[in-house]
Each structure stands twice: as C-alpha cells, then as structure tokens.
Amino acid sequence: MRKMVPVVCFATMLLQVAHSAQGRYAQQLLTDLMENYSNALRPVEDTDKALNVTLQITLSQIKDMDERNQVLIAYLWIRQTWHDAYLRWNKEDYDGLEVIRIPSSLVWRPDLVLYNKADDDFSGPLDTNVVLRYNGEITWDAPAITKSSCVVDVSYFPFDSQECNLTFGSWTYNGNQVDIAMGMDSGDLSDFVENVEWECHGMPATKNVIMYGCCSDPYPDITYTVLLQRRSSFYIFNLLLPCFLISFLAPLGFYLPADSGEKVSLGVTVLLALTVFQLMVAESMPPSESVPLIGKYYIATMTMITASTALTIFIMNIHFCGAEAKPVPHWAKVLIIDYMSKIFFVYEVGENCATATSSSSSSSSSSHFGQDDVHQPNFSSHRQANGKPGGNSGRENQYRHKNPRPQTPGPQRHPKPRHQHHITRDEKNHLSSSKYEGFESNRNLPLGDCCKEAPPCCPEDEKTAVVAAAVASVTFGPCVFCSHGSSLPGVDSKLVRNVEYIANCFREQRATCAKGAEWKRVAKVMDRFFMWIFFIMVFLMSILIIGKAP
C-alpha cells in the first residue's frame, strides 16, 4: 500500500504538466491564428466561390402563441457550421491539439437572421463561444428566443391547427457568396418541452431560392414550418360546454306557464349570458374575416334564442287575448286542439289522457244551452234537456250536498198545467222598471224545487256566481223561480222574462269564459309544440357544429 502512494503522486504530476503544456500550446495557437486574421472579410481563398453554411434548428419550447397579435414566441437552439480557410493549423505542431474554443466575436460569422421576425429588439443569438477544429471547421451553437409573425387561421377554433414558419437567411450576402444548406430535413424535436396548450406534430424544413425585385442575384433561405395542434379540452369545458347547457334552457322557456310572467325574462337572460361568452371569444381572436367555429355556434344559438323569445311573445299574446277576441277558427280547433294536443300530451288539469275530450264540444254544448226553447221546472231538469245529465259540474253537486236548502212548509200543490216562456236579448230594452211590481205580495209563496240548486254560473269565476246569486236573492226573494203555475196571475209573464234575461246573461258569460279558455289551450299546445321543435334544433345544431371540427 505504501508503494502505491508514490506512483499516484507521480501520475498526478504528469497530468498537471500535460495540461499546463496543452494550455501553453493553445495560447500559442490562438496567438498565431489571430496574428494576421480579420473577421470583417468572408473567409474564402477564392472570392468567386460561395461559402457553404449549414443550418440546423432545435425547437426547445413553445413559450406563447398570441392569436390576436399573430405572434409565435419560441425558444430555439441554432447551430451554424462553416469552414474558415484562414483558421487552420497542423495539430502536430501544437502537441496534437485538435480543437479549441474561442469567443465568437473573434471570428467571422454569417449574418443569418430571422426574416419574419416580429420583435422590436433586433438583437441576434447570444455571443457564445465557437468550436474551432484544426481543419478550419467552425461550429457555433447559440440559444435564441424568437418572436415570429404567424398567420393564424381560427376558422375551427377551438379545434384548430396552425402552421407557423421560421425563415432564416443571410441579410447581406447573396447565394453566390453564402450558400445555406440544411443540416437535417426537419427541425430537431428530441429536447422539446411539452406545452400545455399546443401539441407540436413536426417541424419540416424546406430550402427556397428567391429573386427579389431589388437585386438580380438569388437569395437562398431555409424555412422551418412548426406544425401545431391546439389542445381543446380547456376551451370545451370553459366555453363550449357552458354554451351547450345554456342553449338547452331556451326551449324550457316554452314550458313555463304564461301566467308566471318569467317566460320573456328567461329568454333575455340566456341571451345576455351567451353575449358575454361571445365577447370573451372575440377578445382572444384576431379581427379577421374568418369566424371561429365556436363563434358560429354562439351566433346560431343566439339567433335561436332570439327566435324563441319572439315566439314566446307571440304565444303570450294569444294566451292573454281574452274573451273579447274573435272565436278560435275551426281549422285551429281541429288541428291544434283536437290533434296536436294529443300528439304533444297537452291535457287540462283533471282530464283523463286516455279519454280526452275537446273543449270545442263543451263550448258547443254551452251554446245549445243558451238557445234551448224548452225549460223544465228547475235548472237541473233544464240541463238534462240539453244533454247535460247529472248537473253542470262537480262543484255544483258538492254545493248542493254540503248546503242543502230546507224546504219551506206550505200547502200541498197539485199538478197543474205548466206554461213555458222564452225571450231573446232583443227584448231586454222592453223590460221596464215596473217588471218587479206585484212580486212583493208573493214573498210568502211556497218554494219550488228550483230553490234546491244554485243558479248556473261560469265554473271558472266563483266570485261572479256568488254575486249573481245574491242579486237574484235580493231582487226576487228567497229563490229564483224557473217556472210558474197558472195560479199566479199578473206576475208570471214579467217574472219569467226577468228570469230568462238573467239566465241568458249567465249563459253568455259561460260562453265568453269558454272562448277565453279555448285561446289559452291553443297557446298551451303551441308552447309544447315549439318546445320540442327547439329541443331538436339545439341538439342537431350542436352535432353539426362539433362535426365540422377537423
């Protein structure tokens, strides 16, 4: 072990001597090479020959892609190789020294620049050292952050792909003085750092020889095309999916009840939300003629929502047209109320979907009810004569059972011949204020069967029914006679005419309510129809827009 220590020390001393000797030779070599050398002239022995420069680009990172300003910021490693005829030596004269590294500012360098540069700073690559070999070959590796102009096509945003060019060439030397060659057929991507927004699918290179108008000599250049594909997941979840969900709210506006008063508000709110998303996309896109795919989707959705809001206003106008409007046309009754209501499952509350009846039949029955010339002793028998067996509605039956009117005791009446009377509305002008004369003396008459039932009224207007019953009770006594016997002389004709007039008013009110209900049902069926139409439109539009993505 002790014998090995002197050997190691001797070897270390030899290495130090060798390094110091090599350092002395390198210093001597640099002094000899730079003694009569000038870096201002093109280093060729024959000035008529072109100097060949080999260019190789390594793409390290895509730092940013500014679509609005159309600028690509990339981090590159640029390698240039050429031969200097004045920087050669015999390696045997310098202890076998083959390679030295010297500052690049000491030697001649080709003036290769990025033609499509978009940076305000015109500085080139860093002044790193060059590698000089004994045969005159110089290799210069320099990093550079480039800002190049790139024509951005956003027609398929966010599913777009871009092609950005990096064109390198000599700024002052033409092709007869400096010829540029490609070191590889494409850029080197072996050290590429993945970008979170863009995928790089390649970097092919092409050589071009261009004759410019200013000069008659050819100028060669090398163009590297960076193939970029956008990662669309971010935009799908932050721009496309919210728009897709919001667009499905537009058809639901037709499902809202018209009486809620929120149908138009929903459409306007959805329209404003899409406008905000549209402005966000417009701010990030360049102001060009090409409209991005997501912009087309927004515009189509906004157009659909505008149309749905306009249709909602139209349908609400139908819903609230009221009884003063014209009756529903026959074709609308047949097409909308009879057929479309069954297709779109539009039924009234409490109506059996299996045995749905049209409201037009009930309205026709009401009109017959008001035009019948034969009146029975009470309202119940009158309705049976007009095709309404069992009473007018369930509410009237419940009213009779819950509030039975007591029978007033009186002498038993024998059946006598009855007289039926009927008047029209044209006779109401002939009714004088003396039509109630003589009735006060008959307040103690026995009550008939008609007093067991409340007068008919519109089932949709309970307040009107109560008021009408009160008016009848105050005017004619404890009940309204529907018919009279021949034992009431002097009162029967006037009383019957007044009762007929009141009954006609109630019938007319029922017909008016039925007409308004028909318009409401038409509006409800149209709401359901447009709801399904717009649901289908939203779905198909989304499929078509996404299907256009490359």
Swiss-Prot record:
Origin: domain of life: Eukaryota
Residues of the signal peptide: 1-20
Annotated membrane topology: Multi-pass membrane protein
PROSITE patterns, sorted: NEUROTR_ION_CHANNEL (PS00236)
Protein name, UniProt field: Neuronal acetylcholine receptor subunit alpha-9-II
Transmembrane annotation, as ranges: 234-254, 264-284, 298-318, 529-549
Taxonomy of the source species: Eukaryota, Metazoa, Chordata, Craniata, Vertebrata
Stretches assigned to the Extracellular side: 21-233
Matches recorded under Gene3D superfamilies: Neurotransmitter-gated ion-channel ligand-binding domain (2.70.170.10), Neurotransmitter-gated ion-channel transmembrane domain (1.20.58.390)
UniProt keyword terms in alphabetical order: Cell membrane, Disulfide bond, Glycoprotein, Ion channel, Ion transport, Ligand-gated ion channel, Membrane, Postsynaptic cell membrane, Receptor, Signal, Synapse, Transmembrane, Transmembrane helix, Transport
MF GO annotations: acetylcholine-gated monoatomic cation-selective channel activity; transmembrane signaling receptor activity
Span list, region Disordered: 357-439
Matching InterPro entries: Neur_chan_lig-bd (IPR006202), Neur_chan_lig-bd_sf (IPR036734), Neur_channel (IPR006201), Neuro-gated_channel_TM_sf (IPR036719), Neuro_actylchol_rec (IPR038050), Neurotrans-gated_channel_TM (IPR006029), Neurotransmitter_ion_chnl_CS (IPR018000), Nicotinic_acetylcholine_rcpt (IPR002394)
Chief location bin: membrane
Bias-annotated ranges (Low complexity): 358-367
Protein location: Postsynaptic cell membrane; Cell membrane
Organism from which the protein derives: Oncorhynchus mykiss
Positions with biased composition (Basic residues): 413-422
Topological region Cytoplasmic: 319-528
